[in-house]
Amino acid sequence: ARGETDDHLWAFIPKEKILLPGDLFIWAVPNGGNPQKVQRYISDWADALREMSELEAEIMLPGHGYPMFGKENIKQALTSTAEFLDDIENQVIKLMNQGKTLNFIIHKVEFKKNLMELPWLKPVYDDPEFLIRMIWRRYGGWWEGEYDRLFPAKRSVEASLWIDLVGSLDVVITKAIELSNQNEHRLAAHLIETAFYSDPSNSKVHEARDTIYANFSKEQTSSMGRNILNHASLASKEGLRDLAEQKD
């Protein structure tokens, strides 16, 4: 099946009624949106789950997590996960066909509460929002639909211009910290990155950036989101944008 990869394997042992879904079922939101991996296939993933649900397995041994027992329990787990994936993809494609940008879609798609409350659909590893991006990438390519980002200016130049227009780097840093303290983490991150790109070696920027991303990380339920944001925090402790960089 196509899912986490384009050659994902699952198996069924008819005599014992044992299903081995591999990583197509992991007792969590499916790992279909990993920000640091290649293309994943959300609708194909759902198709594979539905195919498995028709086998009437009595024991399921997932790639991660506990075994599941009982024909009806297994069927419900598989079909509800498929419904969850299909619903997200259907919403995304509908909005893409209306000419909406990726940013608009990220903030417009709604995740079904009744499905998110199921014990096997908790966003503890992947974040449902990341699935939106993966679907966009599959059908819409790398351009996010923002016309000014098709041929972007150098970010440091753009950031410096914004800081010049504001009139003070300190004002931006202070506002970013204020937003972080108000749990407006996304806006805080936007502002502090603008501050960073305008003055990458500024110690006050890195101090604020460390705090802002540490706070943002703590709010994440998914380990993917938490770890990436925490990486930014740790990098600023070293005066870097990213830990992979080398200091001059």
Feature map (PLM): residue ranges:
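Accessory terminal helices/loops
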Residues: 54-59, 67-248
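Metallo-beta-lactamase
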Residues: 2-100
